């Protein structure tokens, strides 16, 4: 049995062939590479363009565990002050007086008093005593009585 003759791809119709030829002619005349206008540099300095900076993808964390917060609510407030002047503040100004950690700021003191004693704080004044301790004057909100709170805490 004789081998079958291979069928060649059907020849494209005349219109398609003509269009293809025109396209080729146009490409030869114009050139296939685009001609982009060259941007004129007006400055002698070259500013490198900002490129994409990908986020780091570390293979392992550099710290095995997050650091423990050493300044928690219980560490911030050391003890309430029970001197005569502190008692006068409680009675006259609706203010409690505490000795607090030197590193604590007013916001932290306010949050600690709120959490530990369940009271609202109007404002906090602080000073550092000559012996190096920090003293905090905690003014309570008008709807709380400092005398009652001091009684509950056990100052009086």
Swiss-Prot record:
The UniProt record lists the keyword Thylakoid: no
Induction pattern: May be down-regulated by GNL2 (at protein level).
BP GO terms, sorted: cytoplasmic translation; translation
UniProt modified residues of type Citrulline: 41
Spans annotated as Beta-like import receptor binding (BIB) domain: 32-74
GO cellular component: cytoplasm; cytosol; cytosolic large ribosomal subunit; cytosolic ribosome; extracellular exosome; nucleolus; nucleus
Residues with PTM Phosphoserine: 43
InterPro entries: Nucleotide-bd_a/b_plait_sf (IPR012677), Ribosomal_uL23 (IPR019985), Ribosomal_uL23-like (IPR013025), Ribosomal_uL23/eL15/eS24_sf (IPR012678), Ribosomal_uL23_CS (IPR001014), Ribosomal_uL23_N (IPR005633)
PTM sites of type N,N,N-trimethylalanine: 2
PROSITE patterns to which the protein is assigned, alphabetical: RIBOSOMAL_L23
Subcellular location: Cytoplasm; Nucleus
Protein name: Large ribosomal subunit protein uL23
Organism expressing this protein natively: Homo sapiens (Human)
GN (gene name): RPL23A
């Amino acid at each position: 049995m004789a081998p079958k003759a291979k069928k060649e791809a059907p020849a494209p119709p005349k219109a398609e062939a003509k269009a293809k030829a025109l396209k080729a002619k146009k490409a030869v005349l114009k050139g296939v590479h685009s001609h982009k206008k060259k941007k004129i540099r007006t400055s002698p300095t070259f500013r490198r363009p900002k490129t994409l900076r990908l986020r780091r993808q570390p293979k392992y964390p550099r710290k095995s565990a997050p650091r423990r917060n050493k300044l928690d609510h219980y560490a911030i407030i050391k003890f309430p002050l029970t001197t005569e002047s502190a008692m006068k503040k409680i009675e006259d100004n609706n203010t409690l007086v505490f000795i607090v950690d030197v590193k604590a700021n007013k916001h932290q003191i306010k949050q600690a008093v709120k959490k530990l004693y369940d009271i609202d704080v109007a404002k906090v004044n602080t000073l550092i005593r000559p012996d190096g301790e920090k003293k905090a004057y905690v003014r309570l909100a008008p709807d709380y009585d400092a005398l009652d709170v001091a009684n509950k805490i056990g100052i009086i």
